[in-house]
Amino acid sequence: VTVESEHFAKYDEQHIVCLSYRITTDFHADLEIVTGIDGDVWDIHGPHYIRLSGARNETRLSMEAETGTGDRVAVVSQIQLDFPCEKKDKEQEKRLLDRYCMVTNANEPISLTKLTAIYTTKDAKAPLEEAGKALEAVVEKGYAQCRSEQQEAWEEAWKTAEVEIDGDDEAMEALNYSLYHLMSIAPRHTRGLSIGARGLSGQTYKGAVFWDTEMFMLDFFLYTDPAVAKTLLEYRIDTLG
C-alpha cells in the first residue's frame, strides 16, 4: 500500500487548511478510511476545551468548542472523493468521524481531499457561521486552485526572505527552514498580536510572549515584511503598563 499526502494551512487565507491523500494498492483490497474532527484536545495541564458541540450533514462536519477562558473555536470540514464508497458515521466521545469503506483495484490510485475552515471569537462574533461561509468559498474554489495559490504565495514570500549561502548547503537549508517557521507564525491577519515563545509547536508557555520576539525576530520582519514588524511593536505598546 502506498500513501501520498499533502497538507497545508493557506498562507494567504489564515482560516483555511487543505489536505490531500492518494492511495494505491498493488492488490485487490478492502479499504477503510476514517477522518473527521477531533475535539479531545489536551495540553500539559489537561483538556483544552470545557464544552463541545458538533453537527453533521451529508457533506460536512462541524464542531464548536469553548476554552476555560470563554473563547470559542469553530471547525467546519468537507471531504471530496473520486471513487465510489459506502459512507458510515463513526461515533466516538468528543470526536466527529466519518468512515469510508471501499474496494480498491491493484495499481489504480484513489484520491481524497479534505478542506477545512477554522474561526475563533478572536476573528468573529459568530465563528461557526463564519467558518461555514469560508468553507463554502473554498469548496467552490477547489483543492487544485488552493494548492496553486499556496505555491504562488510562498514563491512571492521567498523572493524577499530566502537566504543563500555559498559553499554550505546544509546551513542554508537549516536557516531557511527556520525562516519558514517565522513566516508561518507571523500575525498578519490582525493588529496588535505577537509571536509566542514556542511559536506553534509547543505548550510550555501557553502562548506567552517575551522580549525574545523583539530581540531575535523583529529584525527579520523589518527587512522582509514591515507590516508584521509594526504589528509586533503595536502588541508591545498595547500591553505596556
Name every feature range the model reports, one short phrase each.
Residues 1-205:
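Acidic/polar, glycine-enriched structural segments that form the non-catalytic walls/loops
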Residues 168-177, 214-241:
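Carboxylate/His-rich catalytic cores and anion/metal-binding grooves
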Residues 186, 191-221, 235, 241:
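Long, K/E/R/D-enriched contiguous segments that form extended
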